[in-house]
UniProtKB/Swiss-Prot annotation:
One of its GO terms (molecular function) is nucleic acid binding. The lineage of its organism: Eukaryota, Metazoa, Chordata, Craniata, Vertebrata. It catalyses: Processing at the authentic HIV-1 PR recognition site and release of the mature p17 matrix and the p24 capsid protein, as a result of the cleavage of the -SQNY-|-PIVQ- cleavage site. This is Endogenous retrovirus group K member 21 Pro protein. It comes from the Eukaryota. Autoproteolytically processed at the N-terminus. Expected C-terminal autoprocessing not detected. The sequence shown is that of the processed Pro protein.
Length: 156
């Protein structure tokens, strides 16, 4: 599972005790939270001994009485003892994200900032091709090693 940061929220599915849930990936949450209206009525829960901070005013906060088996978005085995409260959507916190091996990466730019500034001053628009109609190649040409040492610059 991968998600690029955009106007859409990073949402993924997980299977807890055989039941599928969809939730928001929330690296700022210490624990995972299941929406009270999605918590199965026959699954045991208890009043939480600690409150939840950062999600507004939650009047009723529960926690699963059991540690539950969970499969992540790519079938990663994990366990969770989620909190349960009245929120609009489920939150996958770091308790699950760590077990799933979640990473946040920022790609290294293909070109240096200096070369990007030069290209921009010359009229280059990122994502567009080079040329009068901006229809040229959009990705760099890869250099290929000539193992046979034939062609331009090599004797025949």
């Amino acid at each position: 599972w991968a998600s690029q940061v955009s106007e859409n929220r990073p949402v993924c599915k997980a299977i807890i005790q055989g039941k599928q849930f969809e939730g928001l990936v929330d690296t700022g949450a210490d624990v995972s939270i299941i929406a009270l209206n999605q918590w199965p009525k026959n699954w045991p829960k208890q009043k939480a001994v600690t409150g939840l901070v950062g999600i507004g005013t939650a009047s009723e906060v529960y926690q699963s009485t059991e540690i539950l088996h969970c499969l992540g978005p790519d079938n990663q085995e994990s366990t969770v003892q989620p909190m349960i409260t009245s929120i609009p959507l489920n939150l996958w916190g770091r308790d699950l994200l760590q077990q799933w091996g979640a990473e946040i990466t920022m790609p290294t730019p293909l070109y240096s900032p200096t070369s990007q500034k030069i290209m921009t001053k010359m009229g280059y628009i990122p994502g567009k091709g080079l040329g009068k109609n901006e229809d040229g190649i959009k990705v760099p040409v890869e250099a290929k090693i000539n193992q046979k040492r034939e062609g331009i610059g090599y004797p025949f």
